Amino acid sequence: MKFIKYVLLAFIVLIIFFTVLVNYNLRDRHPDFNIDISLKNNGQISTISVGFAKMPITPDITDTWNDLNGNARYEPDKGDFYNDINGNNRFDPIWIGGFHNSRPAQGVHDDLWARVMVLDDGKTQLAIVSIDAVGFIYDDAVDIRKEVKKNIGCDYTIISSTHVHQAPDLIGIWGPSYFKSGVNKQYMQYVKKQTISAISTAVKNIVPAKLKIAQDLKGAIPFVVDSRDPQELDPGIRIIQALDINTEETLGSLVSWSNHPETLWSKNLLISSDFPHFFRSSIENGVFNEDTTLAEGIGGISVFINGAVGGLMTTNPSHPIPDPFNSTLHEGATFKKTQAQGQQLGLLALRALRSKDAKEISKSIISLRAKTITIPLDNTNFLLGFILGVIDHGTIGWFNVKTEIASIQVGPISIITIPGEIYPEIVNGGVVSPIGQDYNIDPIEIPPLRSMMKGEYKFVFGLANDEIGYIIPKSEWDEVPPYLYNHHKSPYGEINSLGPEAGPIIHSSIREILEY
C-alpha cells in the first residue's frame, strides 16, 4: 500500500513538473509588446536622410572535429571525434542552421554581418536590418527592437534574416539531436549586441541623401529554380542606391532578391553567408578578376534582403551557374559556383542602376502601417519543440503564435514585410487548386499581394521580424494522400509551416493594411 502511495505521489509530482515546464516554455515572452502603428504622412514632402552601418556577427570556432564518413554529421557513436583546441575537455560546437541536425562548423570562409539602412524624413525614422542567419524568431527580434526604441529612438525597426544555411543555428532545430537546441546562448547575445550597435551607428551616420531606384524583373531567372509545383518564381532584383546629396558619394545600397542562400548545400562545414556575400561584394566593389573588369562597384555598404523564398526557391547542386568571365558552367556545391552566382546577380543589379530606367528621388515622406497578428500553431513538431524548449518561442491564447506584418511607402518605393517564407504565387499570382489537395477549396490568397501594392518598385521583405516557416496557399496544402498532381509522396514544405491557416491569415492581414 505504501509503495502505491509513493508511485502515485511521484506521478503527481511528475505531472506538476510537466505542467510547470509547459506553461513556462509556452509563455508569451513579450505580453507588453503589441504593434498597431499608423503613420500616414500627408504633409509636405521633405529631404530624405539616410545612414548605413555594418557589424560582424561571425562566431568564434573554438573546436573542430573529424568527420570520418564525410556525411557532415557529428556522430561519435560512428567514430567521429572532436579536437579539443581550447583544452577544456569538452566539445564546444557551433551548430550550423539548415538542412539537417548535428552539423558543427569547422571554420570560417567569410564573415557574417548585421547590416543596416536607416531612412529618415524628419518625422519618421525607419531602420531596416539584415542579419546573416537562417532565421530570427519574433521574441528575439523584439528583444532588439525594445532596446532600439528605448535607447536609439527609431520609430520602427525591421530585422530580416538572409536565411543563409551556412550560419549558426538561431532557431534551435539544428542542434545535436531533435531534442536539444542548437542555439548557442552566448552567440545569440553577441548577435543582439552587434545588431543594436549597427543600428546605433547607422543612425549616427545619417546625412541628407538622394535615392536611386532600379530593378531587373527577369534577368535572374536562370539562377534560381522552384522545387515544387506550381512553377512560380519571384526572380526580380530590386535595388536602392543612396548617395550623399552634397558629395554624390554612395552611402550604401539595399538590394532584394528571392532565393534560399544554400548554394553551398548540406555538406559545407565552413561559416559563410553563401551567395549574398558575393552579391553584396559585387555591388560594393565591382565584378572583376585579375584580367577583366565587367562592372565597377558603387561603393558604400550593401544590405541584402531576401524575398519570397517559399516553394522552395533554390539553386541545388544539379543546377548550373555560368561563370561571368568565361564559358564555364559551375555545377555541384562549390564556392566557385556560389561566387559566380553572386557576381551574376551583382552584374544585373549594377546594370539596372546604370540604365535609363532608373529613377531618382531626394524628397519624400515615409508612410507606415504595422500590426501584430496571431496564427494558430497547427504543427505537432513545432509544438513539441516549443514545449521542450528546443525552440525558444512563446504562444498566446490556445496555442497561437504572435507575429507581425508591415507596409511602408517612400515615394515610388513600396515595401511589405512577411514574417517567414512565403510562396511566390501568393505574392505574384498563380495560386492553384490542384488535384490531391487536402482541402477541396478554390484559391483563397487572391488577389496577389503585389497587385495591391502602390508605386513602381514593389519590395517584399521575407523573414522580417520573425521566421514562422513556410507560408503556403491553403488550396495547395498537402499532407495526406492522394498527393498533389498524383505524386507518390507529399511535397516538402508543410513539415516546416505553422499550419494551413498561415497563408490565408498573412494574405488577408497584409491586404487590410495595404487598403489603409
Question: What residue ranges belong to the model's regions?
Answer:
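Conserved beta-alpha junction segments in alpha/beta enzyme cores
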Residues: 4-9, 18-161, 167-329, 333-340, ...
